[in-house]
């Protein structure tokens, strides 16, 4: 699929417009047997172990409105999602985005615009059935008081399912295992990871998973300094605020 990036920059940047540049879910590509889909992931320690208490129905964070990006620390950002029953997310420059994983990991139901338009092999490992169910719950309850018994029962059960799925399938270690399994390297005990010094979500997250799995037997060349606690650089500039 060819997308003219200059043309895309000249037109209104909305999910619906961008979607038109992507493959329809009804026309999915059949990839060669040695090409596999992949997704982002999230460190297991970032995933809540229980459903958090909710204080409001919808998060004030709007993905396409940077004036709502008001949080300067990870804790403040995560607490916004923990306090919210639903959080808005959508396709922007691409389908995959850390926000989807951060929502699920913090016990916030993604209200995912146009998720039904996502191609089968894109965000392949995400629980699209649960995401569609989350949209249905939003439409069912968005005008309901946050203390409503039926709302809490049904939505909290759904959040538990999202947390369980994220912990089982979407951790950095789980995706690292997926890469090793698909490339027939499940039995290796040492890794040489050749990447880039610059932060990149997919590359860095896979490296994190391999580091968790192999420890000092995973060597990154060049060294990705931003993932190490011993480094003291300003990491506040490496995320997409």
Where are these regions (language model features)?
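Catalytic core of nucleotide-activated saccharide and alditol-phosphate transferases
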Residues: 1-65, 143-155, 160-186, 195
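Contiguous N-terminal and early-domain "leader" segments and peripheral loops that mark the onset or edge
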Residues: 25-27, 32-50, 212, 216, ...
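Catalytic binding pocket for nucleotide-activated donors in carbohydrate/polymer assembly enzymes
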Residues: 69, 73-197, 201-214, 218-239
